């Protein structure tokens, strides 16, 4: 098995992390959970917990700068040049507070308004929306996306300048999207497409054919698929819940394509309740399990209702039960999830287990 340099920089969803809990990353430059986009703080390999690095620069710009320094490896300061690297750059924006974005990115949309840019029919521009989100809410979000796109482009340009682009697999994805007012929702932690359907792009010149694929790819599939693409498929642990889809990405047959994706949202301290669901090629099903209340069902037909504005569950319970039996239950069993689509008694001895 080849030895890799393993750096991570940017947002790591945690506070200061002791070295023994850094999952083997040998170059550590962590943003933590602090949404201070214009004045971010970082912990490096040796930065003490009570004295983080304080940077006066928009975080995606700074993280692109650091990624470029790592790639250049001037003076051998950042990595062993004789070994391959697996660089993780995790930019926090686009993320609230949305007004923490440099003016130059906002200026690119100076002739537009949030309302002119967001014309989705499932957004209601009423008084509640205007007061709750603010007139520049969507425009600021788009400015952040534009800025992140530019900084990511700088990293790609540097790979090309260093002549590393042909031998480097680049993966771009997000952990979630934001509803931006769609169906009355501000951001994430909901089942709607705007929050759940995220970009997923792979680039490896000469190795991966150019294509688009409607494969129902999920977050747990990233790790085994990357190992498969690196030729390390035989080293994927049996405990990994995801699937190696490297054959599909390389244009080869052989991967069993999933018929659904698994959706889960569990409140803190309550593994056995909360929301579970599946997203098939056509339908989105979500079931909400609350203590002392009947189950709540949501079913969207994404073909006939792409903006998910109508809940058709109550008129299609046979389809709901079919999706539960054929899709949801297998996912629950596969992932070891104790949640089941049954009601929780209000006087349960311990409803949180």
Show where each model-derived region lies.
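Generic structural marker for isolated residues within well-ordered, non-membrane alpha-helices
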Residues: 223, 309, 328
């Amino acid at each position: 098995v080849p030895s890799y340099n393993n750096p991570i920089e940017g947002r790591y969803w945690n506070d200061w992390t002791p070295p023994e809990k850094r999952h083997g990353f040998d170059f550590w430059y962590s943003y933590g959970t602090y949404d201070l986009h214009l004045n971010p703080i970082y912990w490096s390999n040796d930065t003490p917990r009570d004295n983080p690095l304080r940077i006066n620069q928009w975080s995606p710009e700074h993280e692109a700068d650091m990624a470029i320094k790592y790639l250049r490896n001037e003076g051998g300061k950042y990595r062993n040049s004789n070994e391959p690297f697996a660089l993780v750059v995790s930019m926090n924006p686009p993320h609230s507070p949305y007004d923490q974005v440099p003016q130059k990115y906002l200026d690119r949309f100076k002739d537009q308004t949030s309302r002119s840019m967001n014309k989705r029919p499932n957004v209601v521009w009423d008084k509640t929306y205007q007061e709750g989100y603010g007139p520049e809410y969507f425009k600021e979000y788009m400015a952040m996306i534009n800025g992140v796109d530019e900084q990511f482009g700088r990293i790609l340009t540097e790979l090309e300048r260093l002549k590393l682009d042909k031998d480097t697999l680049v993966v771009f994805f997000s952990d979630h999207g934001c509803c931006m007012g769609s169906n009355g929702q501000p951001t994430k932690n909901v089942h709607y497409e705007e929050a759940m359907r995220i970009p997923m792009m792979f680039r490896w010149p000469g190795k991966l054919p150019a294509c688009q694929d409607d494969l129902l790819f999920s977050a747990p599939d990233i790790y085994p698929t990357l190992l498969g693409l690196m030729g390390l498929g035989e080293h994927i642990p049996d405990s990994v819940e995801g699937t190696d889809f490297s054959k599909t990405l390389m244009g080869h047959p052989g991967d069993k394509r999933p018929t659904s994706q698994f959706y889960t949202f569990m409140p803190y301290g309550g593994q056995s309740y909360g929301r579970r669901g599946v997203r098939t090629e056509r339908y989105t099903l979500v079931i909400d399990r609350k203590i002392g209340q009947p189950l709540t069902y949501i079913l969207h037909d994404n073909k006939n209702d792409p903006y998910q504005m109508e809940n058709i569950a109550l008129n299609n319970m046979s389809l709901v039960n079919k999706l539960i039996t054929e899709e949801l239950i297998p996912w629950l069993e596969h992932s070891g999830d104790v949640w089941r689509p049954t009601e929780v008694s209000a006087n349960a001895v311990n409803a949180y287990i």
